[in-house]
């Protein structure tokens, strides 16, 4: 499942974030890549624990916990603290699959990367190239969203970032460990939850709603890991 979640940050917030990022001190993005991924990774990144990265990440996570789309699709259990990257002219990241497990710096806890997310932090017309290309059971998708919008997709997906040929591309990225690790099961639950919400709006007194809601929770009970 690939999901577009719009409008997590508004235009004024994005403007302030972009100004801060343009003044930031960046490090080589290879520091958080695995052995194989590092060979394909050519970008910049704010160091883990950087004050600006923590500020943006905290605001993002707070909004996601209140976002019905994210909560329904991801069924989040743990979220890796968001990282911030920058692709300038020539920057790119070849095809790769993210590491299965991630450990936040300074934490003993590991997170299984069931879902990957990218939040775009500048307008798509401010740079050329830089598309996020995701290859999975849904086919090949090229993603280049408006500033403040986020894409959510399976951590098992082969993906890359096309070379930036003009300007700079700023983004936040992170991983989520879901209560339900299997993508097909999460997709089924997401579609079922959406159908229940729509039926509740259209025919709120329909007797089948109780049964459908019960079936949703029984499936979640069967598949969830806590």
Curated annotation (Swiss-Prot):
Keywords: Dioxygenase, Iron, Metal-binding, Oxidoreductase, Vitamin C. Signal peptide: none annotated. Binds 1 Fe(2+) ion per subunit. 2-oxoglutarate binds at residue 169. Its cofactor is Fe(2+); L-ascorbate. Gene3D superfamilies: q2cbj1_9rhob like domain, Rabenosyn, Rab binding domain. Residues 78-178 form the Fe2OG dioxygenase domain. It comes from the Bacteria. Fe cation binds at residues 96, 98, 159. One of its GO terms (molecular function) is 2-oxoglutarate-dependent dioxygenase activity. HAMAP family: Hydroxyl_YbiX. This is PKHD-type hydroxylase PSEEN1031.
